[in-house]
């Protein structure tokens, strides 16, 4: 998923092309996927990220640019994808193949949402705009999911590699500390 505007990032760069440690975030995510057991990578840019689309060297499914959920729905409706589908946000510069493989190994059918404790995000000093209660704990989504047919499940991890989503310049500074 690489079509966001990145308005909270307050930069002229398209969010997926924003550089963390000198490398565009989307390149770091594509590299993590290439280093994993994932067998096919398809990007989902939008009109909000035209330079991202031309930058990528993987097949793309164009999305409408109407927000993450609408763009995800559009991508999942494309005939080139079959479920289950691993979805990954382009703003996870610490992601690597090992973490992706752990997510895939944790998937037991249906859909899987990867969560981290909200306290971990706060402890790392990164934004935690979206939190909710799950099993008596306050958690945050990571931007990594498996979308399948069937029941939904959640996987809670304390791995900072999925806890650090770059939404602000301060988040980018935190990410660079962990590279």
Regions inferred by a protein language model and the residue ranges of each:
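N-terminal nucleotide-binding beta1-loop-alpha1 segment
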Residues: 1-13
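Active-site glycine-centered loops adjacent to acidic/histidine catalytic or metal-binding residues
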Residues: 4, 91, 168
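Short catalytic helix/loop segments, enriched in acidic residues and glycine
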Residues: 15-29
